From Swiss-Prot:
Organism, scientific name: Pseudoalteromonas translucida (strain TAC 125)
Name of this protein: Peptide chain release factor 2
Main location: cytoplasm
Residues in coiled coil: none
Keywords assigned: Cytoplasm, Methylation, Protein biosynthesis
Residue numbers carrying N5-methylglutamine: 252
Amino acid sequence: MFEVNPVINQIKEIRERTELLRGYLDYALKQERLEEVNAELEDSAVWNEPERAQALGREKSALEAVVETIDTLVTGTDDVEGLLELAVEAEDQETFDEAQSELADLNEQLEALEFRRMFSGPHDSNDAYLDLQSGSGGTEAQDWCNILLRMYLRWGEAKGFKVELVEATGGDVAGIKGATVRFVGEYAYGWLRTETGVHRLVRKSPFDSSGRRHTSFASAFVYPEVDDNIEIDMNPSDLRIDVYRASGAGGQHVNTTESAVRITHVPTNTVVQCQNERSQHKNKAQAMKQLKAKLFELELQQQNAEKQTQEDSKSDIGWGSQIRSYVLDDARIKDLRTGVESRNTQSVLDGNLDKFIEASLKSGL
């Protein structure tokens, strides 16, 4: 005979957790908004504004992820309860096993939805930009910056984000001096926002004929893509716009026309670059979008600076903050904020970052 009470208790627990999430995630409001979005998308006129239609499509996906999951949890627990009753009545082990399996699937869906509570920031659902910049250390630091770029590109692709390399400036000998990546997808900024900071590499340098240990640094800065409706005070006279030939790793030119665009916001010395489009006009439009997003994030950080300094338990998230060390000779990668470690260094550098990111989100960084 099988143990029924543990399964009954699990069903009860899942129902209670689902009910808590229903309130926390504003299920009723999201359900109502989903109906409104569906109605808008059914109106053929919406496709006259492609950007608006795409934004509605993304909103629909985000709303469905909550509404449909909660609906599945509610009906799913009812179904499991029915299976359990059948199993007990018929004394059927196979039906009992099926009930347990379905319950495990429901619990996985519930845990994934519970994790969404970490994305409570006002811009967590936005697309995101990641700026990488090599620190001091010459070729070794530039190679490290390129390794980080590869790591984040692989992570983004594995998470199902659309990943765009907006700009990369080749290193003097190897690697890159810097790069900007755009991540498009649900909660891109929410996933990435705790990656802002300094990443430290310790290894025997392949560029040192003596095989000595070198320490290198690279900075990551993450900021959300902002809606066009958000007003950012940007005086055209404060902008310096330069055009240049796009170049790849190692300094080689990737095209022969001056289509790449660099925009500097002089008052804040904020610089953005774009070279992934063939057209100078498109690169300029993308660079302006990046600049708006970056200035928005800097403004948010400035507004929160006083609060951050008062919260002793939390790290300063400025450019000077070292968040993670990668000591390859000792096969150890450690997050200095959460204490999370991994000995599988190659796996992490191949993009398996969720262990670190989830820990930082759960700790409220």
